[in-house]
Amino acid sequence: MGTTWSVKLMVSPRTDLHPLHAAVQSQLDRVVAQMSTWEADSDISRFNRLSAGSWKILPPEFFSVLSCAIEIAKASDGAYDPTVGPLVDAWGFGASAGARQVPDTQALSDA
């Protein structure tokens, strides 16, 4: 998702950190596989390509995040909008973005 991670902890100098690193990386890989708009085959990318009214079984974690996003959108009266991806792309930001420029009226309407 275009970022890095690090963990700081205090352990004995003899502690083998490889299992911890592998466990953290495994969980992060799972999040990316489900929720990265930068990955064409992620669950969210496939979900976003569905036509309106289509059904898809979602992993429990993805469903939980999606449900929370919808609740925040409702609670904020739309100030937070989880469907803003096409608009972000139109302005030239995001995973599928083109050149950063002010989009024309049609591009904004399409988004």
Q: Model features per residue range: what roles?
A:
Residues 1-111:
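A contiguous, well-ordered beta/alpha segment that forms the leading edge of an enzyme domain
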